[in-house]
């Protein structure tokens, strides 16, 4: 089972600035998975154990509006390849 949180962005600039902002939370920048559609094609992957600290940093320091990004919870079954992807409320 592979579980993670994902931020997708409307612009490459927003993706790169968020990745730099969340660097202390050990996030990973990656292409947006095929099962999600996002404009710029870049996403930031957050491990479940780093979710709370990532959200706190993002909430306190990000200048993005809720129109600039989308937030997802992803669970992928490695054996079957099945993916469960739920869009979450924006980080507030």
Per-region residue spans from a language model:
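N-terminal first-folded block
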Residues: 2-29
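Amphipathic, hydrophobic secondary-structure cores in small proteins
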Residues: 12, 27-55
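Short connector loops at helix/strand junctions that flank enzyme active sites
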Residues: 2, 39-41, 66
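C-terminal structural segments of small proteins and small subunits
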Residues: 57-92
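Ordered hydrophobic segments in well-structured contexts
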Residues: 4-8, 43-45, 70-73
């Amino acid at each position: 089972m592979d579980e993670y949180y994902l931020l997708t962005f409307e612009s490459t600039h927003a993706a790169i600035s968020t990745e730099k902002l969340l660097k202390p939370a050990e996030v990973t920048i990656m292409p947006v998975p095929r099962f999600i559609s996002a404009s710029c094609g870049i996403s930031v992957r957050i491990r479940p154990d780093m979710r709370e600290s990532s959200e706190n940093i993002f909430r306190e320091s990000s200048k993005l509006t809720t129109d600039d990004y989308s937030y997802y919870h992803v669970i992928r079954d490695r054996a079957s390849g099945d993916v469960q992807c739920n869009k979450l409320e924006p980080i507030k």
